[in-house]
């Protein structure tokens, strides 16, 4: 029985057996944990209130909780519930035993066509669900993609996400290598920023580094603004076609998520397995 947001129980830290650390960030740590009551395994994200207040991130955290708690999709990490005490905030998250996609990429340096196409298909399906719910992720990158028991992708870290209001957004956020041109130019943007990120991710998974990576941030900015990237010969023609149709300067010229899911290279190489 998962500790769902729909249950009215108020949790405390005493409801959990705490296991090994799974990761650490600027504002706290994530631990493997088990509910004493029914032995349900979770990841417990422990955040320090003082750090969050010092950085003025209360609003961002509230937004992350509000967004992630309402998303239920097999390729999105579940946020089951949350609680807090005088000094800490605890997020009860789905445990993703495969760890970060970033670590898989580091281990193998680059991924093959099948693995990459499968990830792109899973990610595009999850983002279709997000966009239908008027949520833009804005920070898709290997560090924010976790892996389930069978290697399936789970989008995590909705800290930068936004519920899209009717007015298009202008704040710059996300990771430098993955920033789209419209964010660098501080122009209004829409959900097509996530399509740019899918293109960058697909390139990085197949090549082992992002397409606009440079020795200085100003050079990276320049290359993004000019959409200046080249494919190594190792990248298959079908993948080149997909990536080049996603990494377009004008958001309206990028493929839609539906077109990514129908793209011949994705359909031919994806080995996505759906649950029965």
Swiss-Prot record:
<dbReference type="GO" id="GO:0000793">
    <property type="term" value="C:condensed chromosome"/>
</dbReference>
<dbReference type="GO" id="GO:0051321">
    <property type="term" value="P:meiotic cell cycle"/>
</dbReference>
<dbReference type="GO" id="GO:0000775">
    <property type="term" value="C:chromosome, centromeric region"/>
</dbReference>
<dbReference type="GO" id="GO:0005694">
    <property type="term" value="C:chromosome"/>
</dbReference>
<keyword id="KW-0418">Kinase</keyword>
<dbReference type="InterPro" id="IPR011009">
    <property type="entry name" value="Kinase-like_dom_sf"/>
</dbReference>
<dbReference type="GO" id="GO:0051301">
    <property type="term" value="P:cell division"/>
</dbReference>
<dbReference type="GO" id="GO:0005737">
    <property type="term" value="C:cytoplasm"/>
</dbReference>
<feature type="domain" description="Protein kinase">
    <location>
        <begin position="16"/>
        <end position="266"/>
    </location>
</feature>
<dbReference type="Pfam" id="PF00069">
    <property type="entry name" value="Pkinase"/>
</dbReference>
<keyword id="KW-0498">Mitosis</keyword>
<dbReference type="GO" id="GO:0004672">
    <property type="term" value="F:protein kinase activity"/>
</dbReference>
<feature type="active site" description="Proton acceptor">
    <location>
        <position position="139"/>
    </location>
</feature>
<keyword id="KW-0137">Centromere</keyword>
<keyword id="KW-0963">Cytoplasm</keyword>
<dbReference type="GO" id="GO:0006468">
    <property type="term" value="P:protein phosphorylation"/>
</dbReference>
<comment type="subunit">
    <text>Component of the chromosomal passenger complex (CPC) composed of at least BIRC5/survivin, CDCA8/borealin, INCENP, AURKB or AURKC; predominantly independent AURKB- and AURKC-containing complexes exist; in the complex interacts directly with BIRC5/survivin and INCENP. Interacts with TACC1.</text>
</comment>
<dbReference type="GO" id="GO:0051233">
    <property type="term" value="C:spindle midzone"/>
</dbReference>
<keyword id="KW-0597">Phosphoprotein</keyword>
<dbReference type="InterPro" id="IPR008271">
    <property type="entry name" value="Ser/Thr_kinase_AS"/>
</dbReference>
<keyword id="KW-0067">ATP-binding</keyword>
<dbReference type="GO" id="GO:0004674">
    <property type="term" value="F:protein serine/threonine kinase activity"/>
</dbReference>
<comment type="function">
    <text>Serine/threonine-protein kinase component of the chromosomal passenger complex (CPC), a complex that acts as a key regulator of mitosis. The CPC complex has essential functions at the centromere in ensuring correct chromosome alignment and segregation and is required for chromatin-induced microtubule stabilization and spindle assembly. Also plays a role in meiosis and more particularly in spermatogenesis. Has redundant cellular functions with AURKB and can rescue an AURKB knockdown. Like AURKB, AURKC phosphorylates histone H3 at 'Ser-10' and 'Ser-28'.</text>
</comment>
<feature type="binding site">
    <location>
        <begin position="22"/>
        <end position="30"/>
    </location>
    <ligand>
        <name>ATP</name>
    </ligand>
</feature>
<keyword id="KW-0131">Cell cycle</keyword>
<dbReference type="GO" id="GO:1990385">
    <property type="term" value="C:meiotic spindle midzone"/>
</dbReference>
<dbReference type="InterPro" id="IPR000719">
    <property type="entry name" value="Prot_kinase_dom"/>
</dbReference>
<keyword id="KW-0808">Transferase</keyword>
<keyword id="KW-0469">Meiosis</keyword>
<dbReference type="GO" id="GO:0005634">
    <property type="term" value="C:nucleus"/>
</dbReference>
<dbReference type="GO" id="GO:0030496">
    <property type="term" value="C:midbody"/>
</dbReference>
<dbReference type="GO" id="GO:0106310">
    <property type="term" value="F:protein serine kinase activity"/>
</dbReference>
<keyword id="KW-0539">Nucleus</keyword>
<protein>
    <recommendedName>
        <fullName>Aurora kinase C</fullName>
        <ecNumber>2.7.11.1</ecNumber>
    </recommendedName>
</protein>
<feature type="binding site">
    <location>
        <position position="45"/>
    </location>
    <ligand>
        <name>ATP</name>
    </ligand>
</feature>
<dbReference type="GO" id="GO:0005524">
    <property type="term" value="F:ATP binding"/>
</dbReference>
<keyword id="KW-0723">Serine/threonine-protein kinase</keyword>
<feature type="modified residue" description="Phosphothreonine; by PKA">
    <location>
        <position position="171"/>
    </location>
</feature>
<keyword id="KW-0132">Cell division</keyword>
<dbReference type="InterPro" id="IPR030616">
    <property type="entry name" value="Aur-like"/>
</dbReference>
<dbReference type="InterPro" id="IPR017441">
    <property type="entry name" value="Protein_kinase_ATP_BS"/>
</dbReference>
<keyword id="KW-0206">Cytoskeleton</keyword>
